[in-house]
Amino acid sequence: MVHSFLLIGQSNAAGRGKLEEAEPLDTCGGKLKVLRNGRWQTMYRPVNTDRSFSGTCFAESFAKAYSEIHPDVEVGIIPCADGGTRLEQWECGGLLFDNAVNCAKLAMRTSTLVGVLWHQGESDCASERYPFYYERFQKIMRALRQELNIENVPFIVGGLGDFLVNCSILADLENYIYVNEALQRIAKEEKNCAFASAVGLGANPDNLHFSAQALKEFGTRYFDEYQKIVSEEIIDDNAPKENGSIMSEIELL
């Protein structure tokens, strides 16, 4: 049995942790999986290959924490995050939204979708964008739940890093606090939603992306928030599934 999580958002969801700074990936004896070509493979880095320079991501430590609590299942990540994307690019009917829905539906043929992990907002810190973050994201979240029929599945949103005030790559990043306020409001008002704080987490030298060590901690924060709202009925899905695992040695070549 595979319990899966949809990973969506921009670069800090995809992960830009330096591979050389990260501890070796613990796949929990091969129980941690990643969706590739519609099938489950043992997790490897980078988990979310949106760019050639993708790195570690918080989904790694999240999946490990989940596996430790649920050792009788495999834990699969559905990687659909895309770096640098604005909220408007995730709207219902757009390419990113449809890709996430299609990948999730494919994964749901071989797994039980038990959570959505979202991190996005750096690209929406501009003064003409952040005032509308709450309304836009609320529509996206509700549309995603409807498309996948996951009204009761936990949706965890992560805060933007406070190191953004020191970043010179993008303008208006000091407005991250307003995006965080919108995310916290969403988590408070929407059912089965929680906010994972990024306060105090470290960054790469660019002061835009979380460091490998920070991402490891961030994943545990996501999991802690997930545990607070998940219900047993979500994870106790005994509906028959297709076999999406690698079936022969030659497929590993």
Where are these regions (language model features)?
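Cell-envelope and extracellular/periplasmic
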Residues: M1-L253
